[in-house]
Amino acid sequence: MQVTITSVPVEIPGFKLRRKRSEGPKPILPKGAISSLNSWAEKNNFPTCKFYDIDMLYPNDDAIEKYFRDNKTDVVGFSAVVSTSYLQVKRLARIIKKVNKKTLIVCGGYLTAAANTILRKTKVDICVVGDGEIAWVGILKHMKEHLNSGKNKLDIDKLLEVKGIALLDDNNNLKF
């Protein structure tokens, strides 16, 4: 199972940076939440998640599409820490689903306080609401079982056994 965790830029799509993130006057902060998710996955016998630092690299749509086409990712986790990340989440999810409709897209961070909107207006499949480490591992376990089963459709009821997630059921109802 191929898993990628990405950072999400806070600027609106198309915003032109005046300089590279690494050229700013302040130090670059580590991505603590992403490191924690990866650490929890490793502790639970999942391989190291790939990390695509979209916030730092600030790639265009074609580069993002190429990355996900080349890496054939089964699960993508977004770390969306502020509300201004919404349009970027919408953009990134659209690009990823264009490459592979079956990729499971999980969004975490403060933005998921608006889980209902995210799930209805973007191509995100699951929102993690609150601390994400345990939920992230639960999602990975479920996805591993799903991929091994050979079934096309995720088992929503089984997935909802994972505490701390929100998703839309088959009737488009928001479930926690």
Enumerate the predicted regions with their spans.
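Short glycine-rich His-centered loop
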Residues: 2-28
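Short catalytic helix/loop segments, enriched in acidic residues and glycine
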Residues: 21-41
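Glycine-rich beta-alpha loop elements in corrinoid/cobalamin-binding modules
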Residues: 33, 40, 48-176
